[in-house]
Amino acid sequence: MTQLEEARKGVVTEEMKFIAEREGIDAEKLRRNVAKGYTVIFRNVRHDWVKPVAVGAGVRVKVNANIGTSRDIVDVKAEIEKAKVAVKYGADTIMDLSTGGDLDEIRKTIMHAVDVPVGTVPIYQAAEEMLAKGKAIIEMSEEDMWRAVEKHFKDGVDYTTIHVGVTKEVVEKMKRTKRAVGMVSRGGTFLAAWILHWGEENPFYKDYDYLLELAREYDVVLSLGDGLRPGGLPDAGDELQIAELYTLGRLVRRAREAGVQTMVEGPGHVPIDQIAAQVKLAKVATDNAPFYVLGPIVTDIFPGYDHITAAIGGAIAALNGADFLCYVTPAEHLGLPDVEHVRQGVIAAKIAAHAVNLTRFEADFKKDYLMALARGKLNWARQFELSMDKERFVEIRKERPTKTEACSMCGDLCAIKLINDMLAGERK
């Protein structure tokens, strides 16, 4: 029985109790949101060692970090380090997007390296296995696709991106629609190309009920992928994106009827003034399903800094209802990220998430309140304790030392020290 089914029966599961205690929220309220499908819980029944995480209404905005090998760079040790660094700096979940090497072994190794939920995109494996055989991606059969999905579910992944909304109808529409960037979703493109080649319907859409059966068996959260998300600002909010969104909304309702947990993925690249409207539209179209966004990236002309462009968009999206932020690293659009890129990406996304969480949770705001008090007293030891990135705190303090109580920016001209000294004198 899934978390959704248990919640509908009025049962507060052990996972709900764990999450409620961790987040400092009421377990019964969490149960009600899970029962409605407004909140999902990541915890595959076979992933015994995972610490469950909730995404959606009434809980904190969460951050995901993507890692994984590529066909050009297969370094499993590096990916394990990335996973551990991501978790260290605050990633709530990890997605293994590996496309090179022994994908089964890599996935299992990553899952055992961390205790957070792990997500995947199974069709990547189906596509990679075709290339490994010297075949074209479009030669994969429906059986190949389903085999990959079931393998990932059995291995214990907690959520999977399935591009169910890339239908034959929307692919036909794509032929008549001009886009600046085209399709940028790998999984979505694999399916679109397959549909164009064979003239057949997307197997995951055609046999959606079977997908629901599999997901229900393992209580895997289906992350309904946005295969037609905008890959550049000019494409934001176009006909293809919105058509897919409404398809996903219908599929969310079918999943809920089947007792399967679902969330919906969103853009992408979106001008800053459109983000609020896009998030609110998605929430309406999907009946308040948890919304998982990649960024959104708010400008396309700063490659090397897309962790920042994404954090800006992510904060606005989260403030307007997005529940789950997929980090973006400085390497986005340029190459496979290294460990340092992962660290920077996680921190940027955590800043965006925390900026919103502190407006909703007293415990989160208290951290900032305590930091303000510490700064007001020039209490550097306390500021260090409260810092989210302690290594960076120490690094900059050592690089730019001062002989004063203040920092090397102001030294004896420190505003805080001056006014504190003057007020102390007045009190005497």
From Swiss-Prot:
Biological process (GO), any one: thiamine diphosphate biosynthetic process
Disulfide feature: none
GO molecular function terms noted in the UniProt entry: 4 iron, 4 sulfur cluster binding; carbon-carbon lyase activity; zinc ion binding
Enzyme class at the top of the EC tree: lyase
Keyword 4Fe-4S: yes
Residues that, per the record, bind substrate: N66, M95, Y124, H163, S185, R186, G187, D226, G227, L228, R229, E265, Y292
Protein purpose: Catalyzes the synthesis of the hydroxymethylpyrimidine phosphate (HMP-P) moiety of thiamine from aminoimidazole ribotide (AIR) in a radical S-adenosyl-L-methionine (SAM)-dependent reaction.
HAMAP family xref list: ThiC
NCBIfam families, alphabetized: PRK13352.1, thiC
Protein name in UniProt: Phosphomethylpyrimidine synthase
Organism: Thermococcus kodakarensis (strain ATCC BAA-918 / JCM 12380 / KOD1) (Pyrococcus kodakaraensis (strain KOD1))
Lineage: Archaea, Methanobacteriati, Methanobacteriota, Thermococci, Thermococcales
